[in-house]
Amino acid sequence: MIVTTTPSVEGHQIATYHGIVTGEAILGANVIRDLFAGITDFIGGRSGAYEKELGRARETALSEMEQAARAKGANAVVGVDLDYEVINNMLMVSASGTAVTIA
């Protein structure tokens, strides 16, 4: 499946629009507290453990979005946007885009 932040896929024509698809992942309060407690793991001002957890959350959100697109019969997602938001000491990563079939 092609997943892109652009509104189209170069060299392909969009044949069908299937609508908006989303995926979310939430890191709970314990994960965030543990990550901040592990600040001793800083290397060059960056926390490897925190970045790893964010990466996992991002991949989960993107994977859920792709599954939603497949369920609608799409073979690509265009206009993808990733958002990060803190809600009640939890970090939510959400991915959204438009499911399409490209020729």
Curated annotation (Swiss-Prot):
InterPro entries named among the record's database cross-references: UPF0145_dom_sf, UPF0145_YbjQ-like
Source organism per UniProt: Cereibacter sphaeroides (strain ATCC 17025 / ATH 2.4.3) (Rhodobacter sphaeroides)
Similarity comment: Belongs to the UPF0145 family.
Regions crossing the membrane: none
Protein name: UPF0145 protein Rsph17025_2361
Organism lineage: Bacteria, Pseudomonadati, Pseudomonadota, Alphaproteobacteria, Rhodobacterales
